[in-house]
Amino acid sequence: VSNLFITEPQLEVAETLDRLIGKGNSQSGKILFQNSGAEANEAAMKLARKYQGLGKHGVVSAYKSFHGRTLATLAATGQPEKHEPFAPLPEGFRHAEWNNLDSFEEAIDQTTGAILVEPIQGEGGVNDAGSDFLQGLRKLCDEKGLLLILDEIQTGLGRTGEWFGFHHAGIKPDIVTVAKGIANGV
């Protein structure tokens, strides 16, 4: 079944996800089901571009990050060695030093529309973002009018001791992407 049709089980899962993201309170958010983490991150970046409008298409993500293997998610991935075989990649992606708010602020320019980070980098070496960093990114996004996208592909659905990794920081991202844990290996 595609996203063109709504089924009862799909609706129940969407309502549950909305409630879990809000730590027990419905966020009245929108849930879009995709086939993979890469598709979820791709959709998140497309949504950010659509929301921000023409000229605010840029995304800042962290070095050592991993966001997928589509061209856009690969461009967001902060591992240059993964870029080389597929160059040229889409434009508008910049990278900043992990856990360094100053580096993220320096990477933002007039074309930036969103920041995309993982609460814990998996492929980059199991690097925890820490509450102060995530809270700082939330504040930075609010000040600059940017969307904060949290890639919870590895960390979502209880894998950090909270339903989502960002819950540890007490922040509310604009977009959350989930995969892996939601399918339970299916």
Label for each model-derived stretch:
Residues 43-46, 70-75, 126-127, 158-163:
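Short acidic, glycine/serine/threonine-rich loops at helix termini
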Residues 162, 168-186:
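Active-site PLP attachment segment
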Residues 22-23, 83-90, 167-170:
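Short, conserved catalytic or adaptor-binding loops enriched in Gly and charged residues
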Residues 64-121, 125-131, 143:
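PLP-dependent aminotransferase-class I/II
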Residues 109, 127-161:
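Catalytic PLP-binding core of fold-type I/II PLP enzymes
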Residues 1-54:
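Glycine-rich loop-to-alpha-helix module at the N-terminal edge of alpha/beta enzyme cores
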Residues 8, 37-38, 63-67, 154-157, ...:
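Acidic, glycine-rich active-site loops and adjacent beta-strand->loop/helix elements
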